Amino acid sequence: MELVAGCYEQILFGFAARPGEPWTVTPDFTHHAHTASLSAVAVNSKYVVTGSRDESIQIYDMRKKVEHGALLQHNGTITCLEFYGTAHLLSGAEDGLICIWNTKRWECLKSIKAHKGHVTSLSIHPSGKLALSVGTDKTLRTWNLVEGRSAFIKNLKQNAHIIKWSPDGEKYVTVITNKVDIYKLDTASITGTITIEKRISSIRFITDSVLAIAGDDEIIRFYSCDSQKCLCEFKARENRIKDIYSFEREGQHVIVTASSDGYIKVWNLDLNKINNVPSLLCEVSTKARLTCLAVWLDQASEMKENCGKAATSTEANESEKPSAVKKKKVCGMNKSGKLTKQRRRIVPAKRKLEAPLQKKKKKKQNSSE
């Protein structure tokens, strides 16, 4: 298990977390990942990908602990990244594009002009057939991923900056400043609203009906999507929480938080006692201004992500081809808005992710020298 976090200082941190009594966290690598601050991170069973204000997406092979390459399709800050299974990645950026990537060959299958403004967030339905996105054009858009086209557009009163499907795919939520609107899939109508005092920075479904919410303060809150009531709240850190991640391990529900003062904390949540404050399992300080967080889970260790998605049969039939190549045909939008084939460089890289340097103590010189 690897805790991976990005920061304003352009660094990707990796910490090896080992469950036990107690849990332990040890530094694994610190990697100068980008030439600007990191803005997004996503994981699947093999890769970690990071997005940045430098407009690139960096790929890391976590099994080999090496850089795998860079995707240079977008012309704007990467705002959101999400894997579907082992075969596809979706990326969104401030250029208004959503790109669909084949992760076997790392080629762009389709590049869609999704929003007139920035793409602020996207989320893939557990079936892999639909995706939702929100942007700075005050729209919520539904995408048919089978055909790669827009299926539905809903106008919003304000710009939403987060959208998320529930694990069962029966509902989804949008976040507008400090408000969470809960939608039902079959009616596409709002069934409830949750409002907190400060701007919401991150949300995560713990179960199909329990939502973890982090605002621009130090508090994590658990809300029921059915009653919109707060089930529990606890102080995770002295500074504001930037991101939340959750997963399930051998029946144990684990929450990981990253705060702006550089702390990553791992918590144990008892779903049978959801009103109780989660217990702290371990913590580590990066001494950096963290921006994004994920947990890479090696499937060989019999762990499964809380909101994990099974690969489809079409993904299983994907042919294995070399993934790190110097050039690939990728898709782009021309000035008329039509889909075009372009040749963009996918930069291959095999540098190892380096372990943090240990400071050596200087030996005192003898006064006679």
Curated annotation (Swiss-Prot):
Renumbered ranges of WD repeats: 33-70, 73-111, 114-153, 195-233, 236-278
Repeat found in the keyword field: yes
UniProt GO MF annotations: protein kinase inhibitor activity
InterPro entries for this protein: G-protein_beta_WD-40_rep, PAK1-Kinase_Regulator, WD40/YVTN_repeat-like_dom_sf, WD40_repeat_CS, WD40_repeat_dom_sf, WD40_rpt
Keywords on record: Nucleus, Repeat, Ribosome biogenesis, Signal transduction inhibitor, WD repeat
Basic residues: compositionally biased ranges: 338-350, 358-369
GO CC annotations on file: nucleolus
Main location: nucleus
GO biological process: maturation of LSU-rRNA from tricistronic rRNA transcript (SSU-rRNA, 5.8S rRNA, LSU-rRNA); negative regulation of signal transduction; ribosomal large subunit biogenesis
Function: Negatively regulates the PAK1 kinase. PAK1 is a member of the PAK kinase family, which has been shown to play a positive role in the regulation of signaling pathways involving MAPK8 and RELA. PAK1 exists as an inactive homodimer, which is activated by binding of small GTPases such as CDC42 to an N-terminal regulatory domain. PAK1IP1 also binds to the N-terminus of PAK1, and inhibits the specific activation of PAK1 by CDC42. May be involved in ribosomal large subunit assembly.
Name this polypeptide is given: p21-activated protein kinase-interacting protein 1-like
Native organism: Gallus gallus
Gene name for this UniProt entry: PAK1IP1
